[in-house]
């Protein structure tokens, strides 16, 4: 599925809107994600912090888990928006790789400006994928 510039911007805008709902009482670092499936559905996510820091959940994974819980497992594009255009953490990169190395990742800042566009494979070279399990 090809994504147009207008569709990219729409995903960035959805992620930016979602970002305002992030629960970040500790870091104040709001992250929003908008994930488009190959069937054309979109799922958003925000980061949710916890006083027990390791139990914090990233926006990207929230969007992925929402999609999977609704029966979607094939992804086309994910937009990630932070104030300064931060990229997905290692854990999110690994979870994204589970569902396809060709997923496009759009990284944008809080002004809605696209800063980077790359694939999961480019974000996580030599990813540990299900194929590595020999199944």
Features from the language model and the residues they span:
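C-terminal binding/interaction regions
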Residues: 2-21, 70-135
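Short hydrophobic alpha-helix segments
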Residues: 45-46, 118
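Short, well-ordered amphipathic alpha-helical segments that serve as non-catalytic structural scaffolds
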Residues: 14-17, 59-66
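Short Gly/Pro-enriched turn/cap motifs at secondary-structure boundaries
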Residues: 23-26
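Short beta-strand scaffold segments in enzyme catalytic cores
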Residues: 28-37
């Amino acid at each position: 599925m090809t994504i147009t510039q207008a569709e990219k911007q729409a995903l960035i805008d959805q992620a930016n809107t979602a970002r305002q709902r992030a629960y970040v009482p500790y870091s104040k670092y709001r992250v929003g994600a908008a994930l488009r499936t190959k069937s054309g559905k979109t799922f958003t996510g925000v980061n949710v912090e916890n006083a027990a820091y390791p139990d914090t959940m990233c926006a990207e994974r929230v969007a992925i888990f929402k999609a999977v819980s609704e029966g979607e497992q094939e992804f086309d594009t994910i937009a990630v928006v932070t104030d300064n255009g931060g990229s997905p953490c290692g854990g999110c990169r690994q979870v994204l790789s589970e569902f396809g190395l060709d997923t496009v990742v759009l990284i944008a800042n809080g002004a809605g400006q696209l800063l980077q566009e790359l694939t999961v494979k480019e974000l996580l070279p030599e990813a540990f994928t299900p194929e590595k399990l020999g199944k």
